[in-house]
C-alpha cells in the first residue's frame, strides 16, 4: 500500500487521522482504504461518513479528535443562553486605537496584492488539507442561492446536490455485515428498499437511467404544483424525471394488499409477461391512483406524454430484470386497465379530446393490417445522403426541409431498407343494441389498433376499449362540409372482451375454492338443474338437457385428421306459451359466447358466412354469421321451423362437422363453427298431436332431426292439479317482483299457517346464483376433460341394440349411430358437471335416461306406455322416489276426477278428491317401491296439499273453489 492510500482520511470529521495510526491487524472499511471508493463523481460527497468504522477499544480517546468532531457538528446557536450574546458590556464595546492609522495608505500595486491574495489562498488550502475539511469554495455555487424559489425549473447538478444532503445517521456495526462493509438486504429488496431483480443491484440500474434523479420533500411538493397548462407541464424535463422516478418505485415496490405472500405485484406480472413472451404490461389504474393520485390524474388528462415516460421506464425495468429480453422485444407497452370512468359513445364531446377514455360497443368492421411508418430515413436524390432517422407517430408528420450536405430542398425519397414500420389496424365500434335509446340510430367510433393489439377483436364481438381520444385531419370531411372539420378516433391502449369477464385468468382463488367446494356436494347435479331458469315452473327434462348442453362433452380429434364433435344439440318442440323462448333467453344471459337469432330474421348467409366488398379497400372480405360468431359457445335459434329449407340445409355441415365451407368470389376457405345449437320450434298447426309421430308434427327433415342429440316435446295438457300449481307459482313470482314501495300484503294476501304452499314458494336455498353458475361452467369447461372407460361402452352398446329393436316397431324418430355418440357426449357432460376427470357408471346411466326420455316423448301416445314399461329400469334412475310417487298420485287424482265428472256430470262442484292408499301401493309396486311411509311424511306430500286418513285408508286432496 502506497503513502497516498495510507494518508487517506477515514472520516471527514477527524482531522489528521489516517490509517497508519492503526495496529497492523486492524481492518478498515472500504470507504477508508479502497481507492476505488474515491471517484471524481464523489470527491465532493461525504462518502465515508457512514461507512468507516473504528473500534473504540483500539484507539484511546483523543481530546483533539473529539473537539474536532464536535466542531464539525457545529454549535447550537439557539440554546438557552443565546440572549447572553446581546447583553451590554462597556469594557468590550470599544475599538482599540493602537495600530490604527487612517492616514496610512497601501502602496502595493495590483500585482503585489494579487500575489499576496494567492499566497493567503494557498495557506488556507494547505490548512484545509491538514485538517481534512473540504474547502467547498466553488464559484458556480456563489452565483445562485440554494433557497430561492424564483426558478424551480433549474436543475442542480448531482454533485452540487450531494453537498447539501441532510446528514445521515451513523450506522451501527452488525455482526452479519459482510467484508466490504455493506449490510445484506432483505430478500427481494435492494438497499434502497426496492426489488433488485436478482443479480442486478439498484446502484447499477440507476447509474445508466437518464430519468434517475433525486428529489427532496420540497422538490416533490413543487412538482405537484402545476404551472401553466397540464400538457405543457408534463413535457418539462424535471417533471418527466419525477414521473419516471415515482413510476419506477411503483413497479418495483408495490405490494397488493390481497396478496398474502406479500410479493411485489408488478415484479410478478413482469415475470409472467416474460414467460408468456409478451410485450404488454398491464397496470391497474385503481392501484396506481391509490399510491400516486396526482400522477394518475395527469395520466388520465395528458396521457400522451405520461405514457411515453411510463413505457420508457417499464422498458428499462424489464430489461434490467431480464437482460436477454431486449433481444426478443425492443419495446414494452404499458396498458392501463380498470379506468374507473366509463363513457357512452354518444356522450363523447370536445372536452374528452386528448384524454384517456373507456368506451364499449360491438365491432362491426375490421380492416386489414397495414404498415405504418415508425422510424423513417430519407435519401437525398441529388447527393445520396441518408437523412434520419425521423420518428413518426400519430400526432406529428415528418417533413424534411433541406439536405445538410448539399443544402438542396429535395426531392427526398424514403429509404425502404432502413425504414422501420409498425402494424396498424382500424376497427369500427358501434353502440351495443341494448343501450341505444328508442327511436335513435346507433352511433359508432373509429378505433386504431397498433403493435400487439392487432387482431385482438373480430366483427360481432362486444369489447371495451381504453384509449386516447384524439383527432386527425380528414380531407373528405372538409370537402363534404365546406369548412375545416377533424375526424376523431380512439387510439386504443387496452382492449378487453366482455365475454372474457369470466375467463380463466379472471377467476380469483376464492372463486376456484368455492367452485371446488360446490363440486364435493353429492347433489350438485340436481342443484345445477334447479338453477337453470328457476323462474320457469317444471320442465325438469328440458332443464337437464340444457344443463348438459351448456357443459358439453369432450371433443375428439382422431390423429389430427378426423374430428368428432363434443357439443350437444337440443331441439325444443312444443305448444305455444310453454316458455321455450324464455329458456333460450336464459341461456343467452348465462352461457359463454351465446348468440341469439330467429329463424325468420336469419338467412343462410346470416347463420353461416357472407362475402361482401369492403367500402374502403374495395376488396372482397369474409364476414362470419351467427354460427361463426358463436364458435366455442352456444348458438340459439328461435322459431327454427319458420326458416326456409335452403337456409336450414346450410347449417347441416355446421351442426355435425362444426365447420362452414365457403367458395364465393374467389374465396375458398373453411370457417370454424364449434358450437352447440339449441333451437325452439312450434308444431304444425300450432298444437302437438300425440296421435301422430314426431316427424308428422314438425316441418323438419330426418337429416336435421338426427343431428339433434336431445328432442324435448312440451305439451300443454289440461290438468287441474298441475294448472293450480302453475298458477300459484306465476302469481307468487309476480308478487315477489313488484317494484320498490309496493305493498305486497294488499296485492297477494298470504298466511303461512293457512296456506300450506307458502313454504314451497319461498326461495330454494339449493339454487345457485347466475354469476356463480357462469363461473362454475367456465371453470369446468377449461379445467375438466373427462375420459370414458371400456366397461361403460358395453352397457351403451346393449342399450343401443334394444333401442334399435324397439324403434323398428314404432313410428317415432329412427335410432341411428349418432345416438351412440350422443350418449357418450352426455356422459362426459354429466361427469364434467361434477368436475370428474373420468366417466363413471352414474354418468352413463344419467345419459341413457335423458336419451330414453327424448326417444319415448317422440312416439305416439299408445306406444309410449309400452316403451316406458320396457325401459323402466333405466328411466327411474336417480329420480327421487318421492317425486315419482307424487307423479303417480297426481295421475290417480286426475283419473278419479275424470270418473266423477262422467258419473255426476261436468256441472257438479267437488270440494275434494279421495284416492285409496291401496291404489297408490299397486302403482308403486310396478316401479319396485314397497314402502310408502317416507313419502307420506315428506315435504312433497305435505306441500302439495295432500292429507292422509289412515283410519279410512284414503288420501284427501282439496280442490280450488
Curated annotation (Swiss-Prot):
Gene3D superfamilies: 2.20.28.10, mini-chromosome maintenance (MCM) complex, chain A, domain 1, Nucleic acid-binding proteins, P-loop containing nucleotide triphosphate hydrolases. A motif (Arginine finger) lies at residues 706-709. A zinc finger (C4-type) spans 380-406. One of its GO terms (molecular function) is single-stranded DNA binding. GO terms for cellular component: chromatin; MCM complex; nucleus; THO complex. Its EC number is 3.6.4.12. It is an enzyme of class 3 (hydrolase). InterPro entries: MCM, MCM2, MCM_CS, MCM_dom, MCM_lid, MCM_N, MCM_OB, NA-bd_OB-fold. Its main location: nucleus. ATP binds at residues 574-581. GO terms for biological process: cell cycle DNA replication; DNA replication; double-strand break repair via break-induced replication; embryo development ending in seed dormancy; mitotic DNA replication initiation; regulation of cell population proliferation; regulation of root meristem growth. Residues 1-17 have a biased composition (Polar residues). Component of the minichromosome maintenance (MCM) complex, a heterotetramer composed of MCM2, MCM3, MCM4, MCM5, MCM6 and MCM7. Interacts with CSN5. This is DNA replication licensing factor MCM2. The lineage of its organism: Eukaryota, Viridiplantae, Streptophyta, Embryophyta, Tracheophyta.
Amino acid at each position: 500500500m502506497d503513502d497516498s492510500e495510507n494518508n487517506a482520511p477515514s472520516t471527514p470529521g477527524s482531522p489528521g487521522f489516517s490509517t497508519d495510526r492503526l495496529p497492523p491487524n486492524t481492518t478498515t472499511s472500504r470507504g477508508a482504504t479502497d481507492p476505488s471508493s474515491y471517484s471524481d463523481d464523489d470527491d465532493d460527497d461525504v462518502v465515508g461518513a457512514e461507512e468507516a468504522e473504528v473500534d473504540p477499544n483500539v484507539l484511546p480517546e483523543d481530546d483533539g479528535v473529539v473537539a474536532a468532531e464536535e466542531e464539525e457538528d457545529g454549535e447550537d446557536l439557539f440554546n438557552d443562553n443565546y440572549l447572553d450574546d446581546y447583553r451590554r458590556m462597556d469594557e468590550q464595546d470599544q475599538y482599540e486605537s493602537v495600530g490604527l492609522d487612517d492616514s496610512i495608505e497601501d502602496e502595493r500595486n495590483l500585482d503585489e496584492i494579487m500575489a499576496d491574495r494567492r499566497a493567503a489562498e494557498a495557506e488556507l488550502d494547505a490548512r484545509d488539507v491538514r485538517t481534512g475539511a473540504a474547502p467547498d469554495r466553488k464559484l458556480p455555487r456563489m452565483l445562485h442561492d440554494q433557497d430561492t424559489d424564483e426558478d424551480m425549473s433549474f436543475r442542480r447538478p448531482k454533485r452540487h446536490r450531494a453537498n447539501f444532503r441532510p446528514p445521515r445517521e451513523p450506522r451501527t456495526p452488525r455482526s452479519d455485515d459482510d467484508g466490504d462493509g455493506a449490510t445484506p438486504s432483505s430478500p427481494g429488496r435492494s438497499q434502497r428498499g426496492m426489488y433488485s431483480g436478482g443479480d442486478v443491484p439498484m446502484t447499477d440500474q440507476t447509474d445508466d437511467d437518464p430519468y434517475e434523479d433525486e428529489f427532496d420533500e420540497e422538490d416533490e411538493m413543487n412538482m405537484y404544483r402545476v404551472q401553466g397548462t397540464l400538457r405543457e407541464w408534463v413535457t418539462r424535463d424535471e417533471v418527466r424525471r419525477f414521473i419516471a422516478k415515482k413510476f419506477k418505485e411503483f413497479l418495483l415496490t408495490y405490494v397488493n394488499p390481497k396478496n398474502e405472500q406479500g410479493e411485489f405485484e408488478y415484479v410478478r406480472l413482469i415475470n409472467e409477461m416474460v414467460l408468456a413472451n409478451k410485450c404488454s404490461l398491464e397496470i391497474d389504474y385503481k392501484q396506481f391512483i391509490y399510491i400516486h393520485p396526482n400522477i394518475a390524474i395527469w395520466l388520465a388528462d395528458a396521457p400522451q406524454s405520461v405514457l411515453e415516460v411510463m413505457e420508457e421506464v417499464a422498458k428499462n425495468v424489464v430489461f434490467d430484470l431480464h437482460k436477454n429480453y431486449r433481444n426478443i422485444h425492443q419495446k414494452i407497452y404499458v396498458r392501463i386497465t380498470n379506468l374507473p370512468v366509463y363513457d357512452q359513445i354518444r356522450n363523447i364531446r370536445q372536452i374528452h379530446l386528448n384524454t384517456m377514455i373507456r368506451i364499449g360497443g360491438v365491432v362491426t368492421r375490421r380492416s386489414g393490417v397495414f404498415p405504418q411508418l415508425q422510424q423513417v430515413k430519407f435519401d437525398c436524390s441529388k447527393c445520396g445522403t441518408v437523412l434520419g432517422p425521423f420518428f413518426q407517430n400519430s400526432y406529428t408528420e415528418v417533413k424534411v426541409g433541406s439536405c445538410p450536405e448539399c443544402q438542396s430542398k429535395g426531392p427526398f425519397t424514403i429509404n425502404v431498407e432502413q425504414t422501420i414500420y409498425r402494424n396498424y389496424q382500424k376497427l369500427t365500434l358501434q353502440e351495443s343494441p341494448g343501450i341505444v335509446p328508442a327511436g335513435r340510430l346507433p352511433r359508432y367510433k373509429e378505433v386504431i389498433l397498433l403493435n400487439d393489439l392487432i387482431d385482438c377483436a373480430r366483427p360481432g364481438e362486444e369489447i371495451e376499449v381504453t384509449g386516447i381520444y384524439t383527432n386527425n385531419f380528414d380531407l373528405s370531411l372538409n370537402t363534404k362540409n365546406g369548412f375545416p372539420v377533424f375526424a376523431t378516433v380512439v387510439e386504443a391502449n387496452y382492449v378487453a372482451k366482455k365475454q372474457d369477464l369470466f375467463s380463466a385468468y379472471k377467476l380469483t382463488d376464492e372463486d376456484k375454492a368455492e367452485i371446488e367446494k360446490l363440486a364435493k356436494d353429492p347433489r350438485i347435479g340436481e342443484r345445477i338443474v334447479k338453477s337453470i331458469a328457476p323462474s320457469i315452473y317444471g320442465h325438469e327434462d328440458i332443464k337437464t338437457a340444457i344443463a348438459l348442453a351448456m357443459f358439453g362433452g369432450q371433443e375428439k380429434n382422431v390423429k389430427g385428421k378426423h374430428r368428432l364433435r363434443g357439443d350437444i344439440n337440443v331441439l325444443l318442440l312444443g305448444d305455444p306459451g310453454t316458455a321455450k323462448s324464455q329458456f333460450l333467453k336464459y341461456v343467452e344471459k348465462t352461457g359463454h359466447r351465446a348468440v341469439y337469432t330467429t329463424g325468420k330474421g336469419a338467412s343462410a348467409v346470416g347463420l353461416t358466412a357472407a362475402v361482401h366488398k369492403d367500402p374502403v379497400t374495395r376488396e372482397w372480405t369474409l364476414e362470419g354469421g351467427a354460427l361463426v360468431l358463436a364458435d366455442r359457445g352456444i348458438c340459439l335459434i328461435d322459431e327454427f321451423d319458420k326458416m326456409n329449407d335452403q337456409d336450414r340445409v346450410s347449417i347441416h355441415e355446421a351442426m355435425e362437422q362444426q365447420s362452414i365451407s365457403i367458395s364465393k368470389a374467389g374465396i375458398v376457405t373453411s370457417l370454424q363453427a364449434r358450437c352447440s345449437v339449441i333451437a325452439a320450434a312450434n308444431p304444425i298447426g300450432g298444437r302437438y298431436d300425440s296421435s301422430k309421430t314426431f316427424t308428422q308434427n314438425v316441418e323438419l327433415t330426418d337429416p336435421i332431426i338426427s343431428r339433434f342429440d336431445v328432442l324435448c316435446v312440451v305439451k300443454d295438457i289440461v290438468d287441474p292439479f298441475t294448472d293450480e300449481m302453475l298458477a300459484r307459482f306465476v302469481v307468487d313470482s309476480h308478487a315477489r317482483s313488484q317494484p320498490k314501495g309496493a305493498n305486497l300484503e294488499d296485492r297477494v294476501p298470504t298466511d303461512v299457517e293457512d296456506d300450506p304452499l307458502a313454504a314451497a314458494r319461498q326461495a330454494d336455498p339449493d339454487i345457485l346464483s347466475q354469476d356463480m353458475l357462469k363461473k362454475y361452467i367456465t371453470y369446468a369447461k377449461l379445467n375438466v376433460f373427462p375420459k370414458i372407460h371400456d366397461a361403460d361402452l358395453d352397457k351403451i352398446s346393449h342399450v343401443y341394440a334394444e333401442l334399435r329393436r324397439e324403434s323398428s316397431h314404432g313410428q317415432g324418430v329412427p335410432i341411428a349411430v349418432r345416438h351412440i355418440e350422443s350418449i357418450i357426449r352426455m356422459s362426459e357432460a354429466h361427469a364434467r358437471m361434477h368436475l370428474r376427470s373420468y366417466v363413471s357408471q352414474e354418468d352413463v346411466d344419467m345419459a341413457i335416461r335423458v336419451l330414453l326420455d327424448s326417444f319415448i316423448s317422440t312416439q305416439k301416445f299408445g306406444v309410449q306406455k309400452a316403451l316406458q314399461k320396457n325401459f323402466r329400469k333405466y328411466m327411474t334412475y336417480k329420480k327421487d322416489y318421492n317425486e315419482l310417487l307424487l307423479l303417480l298420485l297426481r295421475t290417480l287424482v286426475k283419473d278419479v276426477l275424470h270418473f266423477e265428472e262422467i258419473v255426476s256430470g261436468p256441472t257438479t262442484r267437488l270440494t275434494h278428491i279421495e284416492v285409496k292408499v291401496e291404489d297408490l301401493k299397486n302403482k308403486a309396486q310396478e316401479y319396485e317401491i314397497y314402502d310408502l311411509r317416507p313419502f307420506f311424511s315428506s315435504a312433497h306430500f305435505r306441500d302439495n296439499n295432500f292429507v292422509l286418513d289412515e283410519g279410512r285408508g284414503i288420501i284427501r286432496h282439496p280442490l280450488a273453489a
